[in-house]
Every structure is written in C-alpha cells, then in structure tokens.
C-alpha cells in the first residue's frame, strides 16, 4: 500500500519505484515488470504509472500494467474506471473503458486497443470464481496465475466447462489436481511448461 492508500500487487521479478510521500499535483511511480493497481481516487492529483514503453494516467481505478525494460511490448488492461494510455515516443493516446486493453508494439510503434485477455488479473488473486469457463479460457487464467505455459493436446475436449470457486494453491499442479476429473484431463509438468491431454488417452 502506497502513501496515498493505493494498493499495488507486484508479479515476481518486478520493480516499482515510488516516493515515500506524493508531493505536488501528481502521484508518479515507475514500473519495470508487471503490477496490478487499485488506485485511490483523487481528482486533484492524477496517478501516473511510467514504464519503459508507455504511460498510464488515472484518477481512481483498477488496472494491470505489464512492461519490460526492453520496451518491445507493453500492455495496460482496465478492469474498473477509466485510464488514459500513451506511448513514450509519440505513438498517440488512447482512453480505455473497462474490459479493454491497450497494447504497444515497441517494434512497429503501434498502439492498439483490443478486448482484455481472460484472467488478466489472475496472477495476484487468491481465488477464482468460475462460471461455465471453457478449458481454453481456464488454461489462460492458470497461465497468468502461475506464470507457466500450458500446451493443450488435440484430443482434449475444449468445449467442456468448469464452474465454481477455485482457490489458488501453492503451484499449478495442486490446482489441476482439484479439477482434472471434472474436466476430463490429465497433465504433466516439465519445468515451466504444462502439457494437458485427455484423461481417456493412453
């Protein structure tokens, strides 16, 4: 929690630079990595998150920003409120609505808007409330939550769905153990890769 009451969750290997107290007419922080922000509303003092590639300006909202030092790709995703996103090198400015994300390609210098990726906030949540969530979407949520890559075999019935609360466990294997029978899968974890196949396959 920052001095103004803003709450920030940082993904691993992320650095957030911020002052002990926010002085002047702005609340300015610098992010390298991925952070989830629940910004305390203050219309007189905008909250600005600066990264290597883009800047996000807000008054009070909930959003996720992912941007590395190399600046090749930066993604800002809005969950609640309104944010203003602009590139650091004249790529333009975009105002996002909830459920949208702005993506900046550092190679082409293009700033585009698209629907938010499912489970974008999952990496910092302690539980997921799932409702008729198909396997492909569920895998995206788990990838975000555990920072892994999930490979789905062709024999998996991706139309199958899962509903209900799912508490985040210490690792992805522990979570998959809870749901594998419900969605008819088996899995194998090799490093940071997870291979999912049908439970009926040999």
Each language-model region and where it sits:
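A residue-level detector for the "anchor" residue at the start of short, highly conserved motifs
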Residues: 1-202
């Amino acid at each position: 929690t920052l001095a103004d009451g803003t709450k920030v969750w940082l993904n691993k290997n992320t650095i957030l630079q911020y002052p002990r107290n926010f002085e002047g007419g702005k609340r300015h922080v610098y992010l390298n990595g991925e952070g989830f922000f629940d910004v305390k509303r203050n219309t007189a003092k905008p909250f600005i998150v600066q990264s290597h590639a883009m800047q996000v300006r807000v008054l009070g909202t909930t959003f996720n920003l992912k941007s590395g030092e190399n600046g090749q790709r930066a993604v800002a995703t809005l969950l609640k409120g309104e944010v203003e996103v602009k590139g650091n090198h004249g790529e333009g400015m975009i105002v996002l609505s909830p459920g949208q994300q702005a993506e900046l390609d550092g190679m082409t210098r293009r700033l585009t808007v698209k629907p938010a990726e499912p489970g974008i906030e999952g990496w910092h949540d302690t539980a997921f409330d799932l409702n008729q969530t198909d396997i492909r979407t569920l895998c995206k949520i788990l990838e975000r939550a555990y920072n892994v890559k999930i490979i789905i075999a062709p024999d998996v019935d991706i139309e199958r769905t899962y509903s209900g609360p799912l508490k985040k466990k210490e690792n992805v294997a522990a979570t998959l153990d809870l749901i594998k029978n419900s969605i008819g899968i088996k899995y194998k974890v090799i490093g940071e890769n997870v291979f999912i196949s049908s439970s009926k396959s040999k």
